[in-house]
Amino acid sequence: GSRRLRTAYTNTQLLELEKEFHFNKYLCRPRRVEIAALLDLTERQVKVWFQNRRMKHKRQTQCKENQNGEGKGKGLEEGDRSEDEEEKAL
């Protein structure tokens, strides 16, 4: 298809985007326009970066919750159960 090339962000751009994300998970359009102009990116690049960053943030926070013991054992129990069932079948 006619997919865009992957954007390679500079360290400066990433630093600014991360800094902005730290204060605001969501951008209003005027702020997006401002950041895009500031970092010499398109609005779309800024928008997509924020979308992707929110998903990454969501994944990371879900991982942390699992490490706290919530939902961690469930996966293991399910795994063990299926192995036990396989052994019984033999």
Curated annotation (Swiss-Prot):
Q: Which InterPro entries match?
A: HD (IPR001356), HD_metazoa (IPR020479), Homeobox_CS (IPR017970), Homeodomain-like_sf (IPR009057)
* Coiled coil ranges: none
The ranges the UniProt entry gives for DNA binding are 2-61
Task: Note the CDD domains from the entry.
Answer: homeodomain
One Pfam match: Homeodomain
Q: Where is this region: Disordered?
A: 55-90
The record's family statement is: Belongs to the Antp homeobox family.
Q: What is this protein called?
A: Homeobox protein Hox-A2
